[in-house]
């Protein structure tokens, strides 16, 4: 019984964190020429969940004003303590009918119309180590999502083995980490399925043309001014930019 009450308290606290995120979202949407273009999923690796002391991912929003297609330069003045994360992203095929939820893995064939390379810049505006910040603070600040960069080359999902696809992160032409899509809940599609069903429980459908950034394939790396960043997705392409 004590365990049940503890889980209920944790769920209530988590709901409050998302309520704060929702209020923040309204502030973002008040900005000129801004709208929500999709969702990000965070904490999709076992290591990240252990570090944050949680047992499932969390989500945040992607915004038009805080995203770009293949940007060349990123200005450090707009960030506090940024980290770069190479991610596989997906596009929603049609408005999702959440009355059919919960969806199964096989349903993703008709829910999604392709994947592409992306990079998320996460930024923690707390003067504490991540382990002390905690997942709830990260959730309330939009999952720490600060900027999102995407490749325009849409690829058929069936053409990629997402159970085992290698992704490398280079900083100043040096490979700092080689990751794999299996680091993202064993397969990034699992993160997508979790998100769609989680949102459906809240009565929130994803809409045609929106994006889902599924979680980092590598470790997150801090970036500093005067750095050249490259996320190499092999045959899927790459994303390169300078952090100035």
Where are the regions that the model predicts?
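Single conserved hydrophobic/aromatic residue that forms the stacking wall/gate
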Residues: 1-13
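Glycine-enriched loop-and-adjacent helix/strand subsegments that border the catalytic/binding cleft
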Residues: 18-22, 27-189
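Catalytic-pocket segment enriched in acidic/His residues
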Residues: 141-143, 148-244
């Amino acid at each position: 019984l004590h365990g049940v009450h503890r889980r209920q308290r944790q769920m209530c606290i988590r709901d409050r964190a998302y309520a704060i995120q929702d209020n923040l979202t309204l502030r973002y949407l008040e900005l000129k020429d801004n709208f929500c273009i999709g969702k990000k999923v965070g904490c999709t690796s076992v290591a990240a969940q252990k570090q944050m002391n949680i047992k499932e991912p969390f989500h945040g929003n992607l915004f038009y004003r805080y995203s770009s297609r293949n940007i060349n330069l990123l200005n450090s003045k707009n960030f506090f303590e940024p980290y770069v994360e190479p991610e596989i992203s997906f596009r929603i095929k049609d408005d999702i009918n959440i009355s059919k939820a919960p969806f199964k893995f096989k349903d993703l064939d008709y829910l999604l119309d392709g994947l592409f390379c992306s990079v998320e810049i996460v930024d923690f505006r707390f003067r504490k180590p991540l382990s002390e910040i905690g997942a709830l603070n990260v959730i309330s600040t939009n999952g720490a999502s600060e900027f999102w960069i995407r490749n325009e080359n849409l690829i058929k999902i069936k053409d990629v083995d997402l159970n085992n696809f290698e992704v490398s992160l280079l900083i100043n032409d040096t490979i700092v980490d080689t990751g794999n899509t299996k680091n993202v809940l064993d397969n990034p599609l699992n993160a997508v399925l979790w998100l769609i069903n989680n949102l459906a429980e809240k009565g929130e459908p994803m809409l045609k043309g929106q994006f889902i950034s599924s979680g980092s394939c590598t470790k997150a790396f801090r970036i500093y001014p005067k750095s050249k960043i490259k996320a190499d997705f092999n045959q899927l392409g790459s994303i390169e930019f300078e952090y100035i």
